[in-house]
């Protein structure tokens, strides 16, 4: 009697016990990512529910709620705003608006992006142009920044700042000749351009970071050069609950800030790790992870740095989740918001200080 032929499912299940630990993890990740594509319709519904979470449609242009249906176009439902008289769909003002690529490709791009791939490698994996890969990344980051928000803190808050060198990448045109003594488009000779100032100067940008014991994180650009009190106050005012405890190093400005915002201030002296139960080790550890994260990109233009800080914040929020969950959350959050982002705005943007 002939043996019954194994089904594809039975063949796969019989091979799983023979896999090494690394191979099993690869297969498990592949299955998880395939599961996302199989349930793309559910993700699209979740995007719609998140976008209209208040129970009513909102105009992406004027944000009015007097909306009526306005027929369909290529099977896609259109809506009309009675206030501004503009027509829109569920995709209007999302990163994928006007894109001719499929949602599956956008999900694949998100997987590459969250895996830390460079813009060039993302383009190769998704078979898109490098320029397209660049603009997709920044459209997604703009949307994630809108969804994640600035952040509010309470209770015991650790605060500190870290510095990145000001990067003017993309702010000037290239010159053909770059020989000795030839001036660059920044007005300096190439020999002068190589020189870097030591210590804190206008060539460095201060990034403020604050973390409470509940895991809430506030991060953003404060100012260029040495930390200035008006910029420090602007960064924290309205984002730390009254009577919270602010734990910092011996940097100037935090004592005055605590008095004005009605906070309890604990100062950790230089050279000491902690004071009683108070310390800033969590925020120092965060700085280490941030530097590692940024080092993978080999120099980010300062005008785009705020978006990369929000990307880091997204990773911190979902660091305990599975890879597939991170991709799903990134897709829903980026597609459910109304970021004011276009190719023109990305090209002409300047550094945004919180």
What are these regions, as identified by a protein language model?
Residues 1-354:
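Residue-level recognition of single "structural anchor" positions
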